[in-house]
Curated annotation (Swiss-Prot):
The name this protein goes by in its record: GTPase Obg
Keywords, sorted A to Z: Cytoplasm, GTP-binding, Hydrolase, Magnesium, Metal-binding, Nucleotide-binding
Cross-referenced SUPFAM superfamilies: Obg GTP-binding protein N-terminal domain (SSF82051), P-loop containing nucleoside triphosphate hydrolases (SSF52540)
Species, as recorded: Anaeromyxobacter dehalogenans (strain 2CP-C)
Residues annotated as binding Mg(2+): S173, T193
One example GO MF annotation: GTPase activity
Underlying gene: obg
Length: 354
C-alpha cells in the first residue's frame, strides 16, 4: 500500500431544504389555513478516527466530499427529511488544518473520535409557522441556509513512542527489522526508505512502538530531501534513537559532525524536537573502523559538562542492542533498573509484533 501522509480536500455540508408554501385542502373546509412543512436540515461532514487505517491514500484522488442536502418541506404539515451526514474516516494521528489560513482545527488520535468539520445548513420554516392573527394566510416560507464548506489539509503524524533518526544509510531500517517484526526495504544505498516504518518492540513485560524515519539531510527543516514530510512524524515521539554511521561515511563526514548536523535540523524545525530525550548509538561496529569511530565519539561526548552516553551497536551481530533497548525503555517508562545482560553478547531477537 502506498503511504500518503498529506492531502488537500474540499468538504461541503448539505444545504438546508426550503420550507413549503401550502394550504389545507380538506373536504368541507374551502378556505383551509397554511400547511407548509419545514425543510430538512443538511447533513454534516464528520471526521472519524478509524484505527484500521494507516494512510490518507483514500483521499489522494477523491478531493471533493459533499454531504446530502435536506429535503424540501411539503403540504399537510409534512417536514422534509434531514440530509444524511457524510462520515470521512481517517487514521489515528491525523491533524486537520484550514487550507486558507493554516489554522489547526483538530488533532485526531483516539479510535472512534468524531469531529463535525462542516455543519449542515438549517432547514427553512414552512408558511404554517408564519400564520398570525393579522396574517392568517402567509404566502411565503423560509429558504434553507447553505451548508458550510471549506478547504482542508489533512496531515498524518505517526503515533509512535520512539523515532529512529539519522543520516540516510545509517542503519535505521536494519535496526528496526532486528528489534521488531517490521520488514522495511533494506539496501546499501541512501534513501532506500522513503516512507516511515512502524514496529512494536517487546521490552520486559511492556511494549512500545518504534518508527523508522527516512534519512534526514542538511536543510531538512526547510524541506530538503522531503524533510518536512519526514520531520512531521518525529513530533509525536517521546524519545529519539539517534543513529550515527560509524563505518565509511561519505567524504567530509564524521560521526560527531553527523550528530551535530541532524540535531541542528531538529532544532531548526522545532524547539520541541530539540528538547526530546535522545539515545545516541553508533552503528555497524562489527566493522573495526566503525568501532574505533564509536569509541572516539564516546570519549568526545563523555567530556561534556553534561556527559552524553553513546551506545555501540551492530544490528548484524546483535552486539549492544540489549543495552540500547534498556536505555530506551528506561527513558520511556522512567525505570532505572540496570541492564542484566553481559555487554557484547549477541541479542536473542526480542519478542515483538509488527
Amino acid at each position: 500500500m502506498k503511504f500518503v501522509d498529506e492531502v488537500k480536500i474540499h468538504v461541503k455540508a448539505g444545504d438546508g431544504g426550503d420550507g413549503a408554501v401550502a394550504w389545507r385542502r380538506e373536504k368541507f373546509i374551502p378556505r383551509g389555513g397554511p400547511a407548509g412543512g419545514d425543510g430538512g436540515n443538511g447533513g454534516d461532514v464528520v471526521l472519524e478516527v478509524d484505527p484500521q487505517l494507516s494512510t490518507l491514500l483514500d483521499y489522494r484522488y477523491i478531493r471533493e466530499h459533499k454531504a446530502r442536502n435536506g429535503e424540501k418541506g411539503s403540504g399537510s404539515d409534512m417536514n422534509g427529511k434531514d440530509g444524511a451526514d457524510l462520515v470521512l474516516r481517517v487514521p489515528p494521528g491525523t491533524v486537520v488544518k484550514d487550507a486558507a489560513t493554516g489554522e489547526q482545527l483538530c488533532d485526531l488520535g483516539t479510535a472512534g473520535e468524531r469531529v463535525v468539520i462542516a455543519k449542515g445548513g438549517r432547514g427553512g420554516l414552512g408558511n404554517m409557522n408564519f400564520a398570525s392573527s393579522t396574517n392568517q394566510a402567509p404566502r411565503y416560507a423560509e429558504d434553507g441556509t447553505p451548508g458550510a464548506e471549506r478547504d482542508l489539509v489533512l496531515e498524518l503524524k505517526l503515533l509512535a513512542d520512539v523515532g529512529i533518526v539519522g543520516y540516510p544509510n545509517a542503519g535505521k531500517s536494519t535496526l528496526i527489522s532486528r528489534i521488531s517484526r517490521a520488514r522495511p526495504k533494506i539496501a546499501d544505498y541512501p534513501f532506500t526508505t522513503l516512507t516511515p516504518n512502524l514496529g512494536v518492540v517487546g521490552w520486559r513485560e511492556r511494549s512500545f512502538v518504534v518508527a523508522d524515519i527516512p534519512g534526514l539531510i542538511e536543510g531538512a527543516h526547510a524541506g530538503a530531501g522531503l524533510g518536512h514530510q519526514f520531520l512531521r512524524h518525529v513530533e509525536r515521539c517521546r524519545v529519539l534513537i539517534h543513529l550515527v554511521e560509524g563505518a565509511n561515511p561519505e567524504p567530509g563526514r564524521a560521526p560527531k559532525a553527523d550528530l551535530d548536523a541532524i540535531n541542528a535540523e531538529l532544532a531548526a524545525y522545532s524547539d520541541e524536537l530539540a528538547k526530546k530525550p535522545q539515545i545516541v548509538a553508533v552503528t555497524k561496529i562489527d566493522v573495526p573502523e566503525a568501532r574505533a569511530a564509536g569509541v572516539k565519539l564516546q570519549k568526545l561526548l563523555g567530556r561534556r559538562k553534561k556527559p552524553v552516553p553513546v551506545h555501540l551497536v551492530s544490528a548484524v551481530t546483535g552486539e549492544g542492542l540489549d543495552a540500547l533497548l534498556d536505555a530506551v525503555g528506561r527513558a520511556l517508562f522512567k525505570e532505572a533498573r540496570p541492564h542484566r545482560g553481559g555487554g557484547g553478547k549477541k541479542l536473542a531477537k526480542p519478542r515483538a509484533r509488527a
